[in-house]
Amino acid sequence: MMLKPSIDTLLDKVPSKYSLVILEAKRAHELEAGAKPTQEFTSVKSTLRALEEIESGNVVIHPDPEAKREAVRRRAEEAKRLAEEEERKIKAQIAKEKEEGEKI
């Protein structure tokens, strides 16, 4: 029985068998948790779906882990900044409404 996608095809997409297993497992868990698929699948199982995505090149190992960490950190900082800005706007609106209420 021939497995599809073939291991040879998949190993062209990742540096090693070990990387392939880790990437497949992580993507399969993401799919099980409800992550949006990147394509239509022929397989039913999440592990085989993950392999199909890897074969098509839609799922890859991030080439620079440090750059990925930096991008995640920047996104977190931006989200925090936006939340603080929103909180300041709400406090200013509350103060304005309170001030207008005292004038009446």
Curated annotation (Swiss-Prot):
<dbReference type="GO" id="GO:0000428">
    <property type="term" value="C:DNA-directed RNA polymerase complex"/>
</dbReference>
<dbReference type="GO" id="GO:0003899">
    <property type="term" value="F:DNA-directed RNA polymerase activity"/>
</dbReference>
<keyword id="KW-0808">Transferase</keyword>
<dbReference type="GO" id="GO:0006351">
    <property type="term" value="P:DNA-templated transcription"/>
</dbReference>
<comment type="function">
    <text>Promotes RNA polymerase assembly. Latches the N- and C-terminal regions of the beta' subunit thereby facilitating its interaction with the beta and alpha subunits.</text>
</comment>
<dbReference type="Pfam" id="PF01192">
    <property type="entry name" value="RNA_pol_Rpb6"/>
</dbReference>
<dbReference type="InterPro" id="IPR006110">
    <property type="entry name" value="Pol_omega/Rpo6/RPB6"/>
</dbReference>
<comment type="similarity">
    <text>Belongs to the RNA polymerase subunit omega family.</text>
</comment>
<dbReference type="InterPro" id="IPR003716">
    <property type="entry name" value="DNA-dir_RNA_pol_omega"/>
</dbReference>
<keyword id="KW-0548">Nucleotidyltransferase</keyword>
<protein>
    <recommendedName>
        <fullName>DNA-directed RNA polymerase subunit omega</fullName>
        <ecNumber>2.7.7.6</ecNumber>
    </recommendedName>
</protein>
<keyword id="KW-0804">Transcription</keyword>
<dbReference type="InterPro" id="IPR036161">
    <property type="entry name" value="RPB6/omega-like_sf"/>
</dbReference>
<keyword id="KW-0240">DNA-directed RNA polymerase</keyword>
<dbReference type="GO" id="GO:0003677">
    <property type="term" value="F:DNA binding"/>
</dbReference>
<comment type="subunit">
    <text>The RNAP catalytic core consists of 2 alpha, 1 beta, 1 beta' and 1 omega subunit. When a sigma factor is associated with the core the holoenzyme is formed, which can initiate transcription.</text>
</comment>
